Amino acid sequence: MKNNKIYIKTWGCQMNEYDSALITQILKQKHGYENTKDPKLANVLILNTCSIREKAQEKVFHQLGRWKKLKQKNPNLIIAVGGCVATQEGKNIYKRANYVDIIFGTQTLHYLPNMIQEVKKNKKSVTNIDFPLTEKFNFIEYPRKPKVTAFVSIMEGCNKFCSFCIVPYTRGHEISRPVDDILLEISTLSSRGVKEIHLLGQNVNSYKGKTFNGDICKFSNLLRLVASIDGIDRIRFTTSNPFEFTDDIIEIYAEIPKIVSFLHLPVQSGSNRILQLMKRMHTIDEYKTIINKILKLRPNIQISSDFIIGFPGETLIDFEQTLQLIKDLNIDMSYSFIYSPRPGTPASELQDNVTLCEKQKRLHILQTLIRNNTTMWNQKMLGSIQSVLVEGRSQKNPKELFGRTENNRIVNFKGNQNMIGEFINLKITKINPNSLRGSYEKRNN
């Protein structure tokens, strides 16, 4: 196995990124596989997929088509497809790509080593997209040299069943990891240099994990426990649901400074009528109340959200209400997309009566408003001193470094290699469309 190499391509959410890292750890540390950045050098190609939107799903088959050429040159090459498309489509993937060897689900990635061996032995395709009792988290192997920031999944799945969303069908019902398992993972990461933890879950604030004595731990209490771990200086979490963003979570913003002043809280629409069609479990007033309560505790917190544009039945008035919500709350970051019907969801049965041209027009208007809000926030930061966690070398200029502010802004600057992994003070000197520039400011003793 020492000469075996794997190449993993990941699409989709941060949970997929976490899963890909877990796949890498399992295959490398327990089974001797080495990562390669060149698919031409790999013995196993793994595609970790997303099915949230139609275009993302089609990208999978385009990518598989490119890998088919590598398979033709090397018949022993193993191609594996995992993630949400794999769970949703199952063996139907073979109909469009019969050269695929393995199909595994979001909850069966820990079986991948055995599936690879089975393909090698029997020369037949293998499929496992079940939701097994054995949790994949039991197979975590911690990286020896992690980055200074790390994702940690605390729960998976969703019980909300919004009418547009495929996630409950591809990730299953909500399952919370035991508290001790999470704390052990974070403590281990901290001991190896991680200073910022990003807690993950499809509905992260619905976390209800068990303690060692069988008690249920709420999300707010988990945050307290994570904050108590030595070496962890920043805590982020994604993705929250307004329905369960309760007062005990809101109060954490006053209690724990390690919780960053940045919140991603998807609302999807500014219209109560559309929210009902989406089967969302909150109203606009309830959403505003949550944000305003947090703003009283953290006046400088920045809000990010999700918006679906052109949901079936969305009128111009509904859309204008969405724009007004963005203005009222100064939302300055978003994941905003044109509605894409997912087969098998209740919304796919609704009449899609908004033209593509109109959807594109509305999306442009909304994203322009968001960009304007981003510029406004960035201008407020110009000249300020920001505490930045230095993550590594800048992608655009390897001679420079980059870090992230507490409110999730990327800052590029000139600095020394030994700054990586440290918190430093940067003066914001310039604003760019997607990042900031800064200059190093020595701390006063």
UniProtKB/Swiss-Prot annotation:
- Show where the TRAM domain sits: 379-442
InterPro entries documented for this protein: Elp3/MiaA/NifB-like_rSAM (IPR006638), Methylthiotransferase (IPR005839), Methylthiotransferase_CS (IPR020612), Methylthiotransferase_N (IPR013848), Methylthiotransferase_N_sf (IPR038135), MiaB_methiolase (IPR006463), rSAM (IPR007197), rSAM_horseshoe (IPR023404)
What the record notes about the co-factor is: Binds 2 [4Fe-4S] clusters. One cluster is coordinated with 3 cysteines and an exchangeable S-adenosyl-L-methionine.
A Pfam family found in this protein is: UPF0004
The name under which this protein is listed is tRNA-2-methylthio-N(6)-dimethylallyladenosine synthase
Gene from which this protein is expressed: miaB
Which NCBIfam families does this chain map to?
miaB-methiolase (TIGR01574), MiaB/RimO family radical SAM methylthiotransferase (TIGR00089)
Q: Reply yes or no: does the keyword Iron-sulfur apply.
A: yes
How it assembles, according to the record, is: Monomer.
Gene source species:
Buchnera aphidicola subsp. Baizongia pistaciae (strain Bp)
